Regions:
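Oxyanion-binding/catalytic loops of NTP- or PPi-dependent enzymes
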Residues: 1-80, 88-92, 104-114, 118, ...
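Glycine-rich phosphate/pyrophosphate-binding loop
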Residues: 94-96
Length: 377
């Protein structure tokens, strides 16, 4: 059985081998691959290959395609999501969301399901090449996905000639992966409640799972769809892009290529600041032969990130209310997702739940592992 963690930024694929799960490596020996599809004059490209040409081919590169699955032109979050898109979504006469991209010399329109269909086909080709000759998959989705979004995902999987045996919530996949190898830590009758805080690229989910020795139950899930690492990166991009414009008179935010260079460097700055008090934001010849060079302290980073920190804190509080729990009901807190490595986010969780934090799960792989283990749980 193949388990697929379909993230907005990266995708990870696992396969059950005996009682364990192996992560299927890419052609470049990476454990995860970018969720990207690009079109050009000769071919479609995917993942790392699409990422390699993203700055020169941004207009034909579809980023965050999973966010558009099952949506139509009246989707209330459409305008918010547009600002993160490269190949801009358009609305057809019958209200469908389509991506317009130039492929082999002509412009074509693609539904999000079609884009994801060719992406799934690429994943399938990779695991078959690695010797896993199966079409049966379990795919995880955000818990907030409604029936029409899940159906759109199933339609995309069918395009790749795969058999989707189950679509499971990310909270279930994470809970399965967490609990399966910890059964001996729990009592047969008296449950222990674990809080999972998952802050990824585009969203934050907080959920509580009750564990006993032979069972688990997800109590509740609270999500903020626009509280992730990319939201922080965009705030910093606008701030430092504005400073650059003020100093040199040219605006890098009006150039998609410059914005991509800025975002790439800011993501590195964010990661460096998890272990350092300050670092440099340096980009040679960002625009009109002018260099960007600023020192960014962790304090300044946290001040600029304040709107997202506030949303994150509110999500933690709202999660307790929706679960009808008190901090004293929680036995442990498990941190999941790339953005929870940010020190201020960890501090906020400690303050909200009053517990030390555990980081035993691989942020990039735990959903894929849980998805693959789903049929054997």
């Amino acid at each position: 059985m193949i388990g697929i963690s379909l993230g907005s930024l990266n995708t990870c694929v696992g396969v059950v081998k005996g009682s364990n799960v192996d992560i299927i490596l890419t052609d470049t020996s990476q454990r995860c691959l970018p969720t990207l599809v690009a079109f050009n004059e000769r071919e479609r490209s995917f993942a790392d290959q699409a990422n390699f040409t993203i700055k020169s081919n941004f207009a034909n590169t579809i980023k965050y395609p999973t966010r558009f699955l099952g949506q139509t032109g009246d989707w209330p979050f459409l305008n918010e999501e547009r600002k993160y898109s490269l190949c801009q979504p358009i609305i057809s006469e019958n209200g469908e969301i389509l991506f317009e991209a130039e492929y082999k010399g002509s412009k074509d329109h693609y539904k999000p399901e079609a884009v994801m269909g060719v992406f799934f086909d690429k994943l399938k080709q990779n695991w078959i090449k690695k010797g896993y000759n199966t079409k049966d998959v379990v795919v995880s989705v955000p818990d907030y996905f409604l029936a029409h979004e899940r159906q759109a995902l199933v339609d995309a999987i069918k395009i790749a000639d795969l058999n989707c045996t189950s679509v499971i919530n990310e909270s279930s996949a994470i809970s399965i992966n967490y609990g399966l190898f910890r059964r001996n830590q729990y009592d047969e009758k008296t449950p222990k409640i674990v809080a999972f805080v998952d802050m990824g690229e585009s969203k934050t989910s907080v959920f509580f799972t009750s564990f006993t020795k032979n069972n688990h139950r997800v109590i509740s899930v609270t999500t903020d769809r626009f509280c992730g690492a990319r939201d922080i990166d965009y705030i910093l991009m606008e701030h430092y892009g504005g400073k650059f414009k003020q100093k040199y008179g040219c605006d890098p935010l009006k150039s998609t290529k410059c914005k991509l260079r800025l975002l790439e460097t800011i993501a590195k700055v964010r990661k460096i600041l998890t272990g350092n008090r300050d670092t440099n934001l340096t980009i040679d010849s960002l625009m009109e032969d002018e260099d960007m060079n600023y020192t960014v302290s962790r304090e300044e980073f946290e001040n600029l990130s304040a709107p997202i920190i506030t949303r994150f804190r509110e999500t933690l509080s709202r999660a307790l209310v929706e679960a009808k729990l008190k901090p004293s009901d929680i036995s442990s807190v498990e941190m999941v997702g790339d953005a929870v490595r940010i020190p201020i986010m960890q501090q906020v969780v400690k303050e909200a739940y009053g517990l030390e934090l555990s980081k035993t799960l691989s942020p990039d792989e735990c959903v894929a592992r849980g998805s693959a283990l789903y049929v054997n749980k």
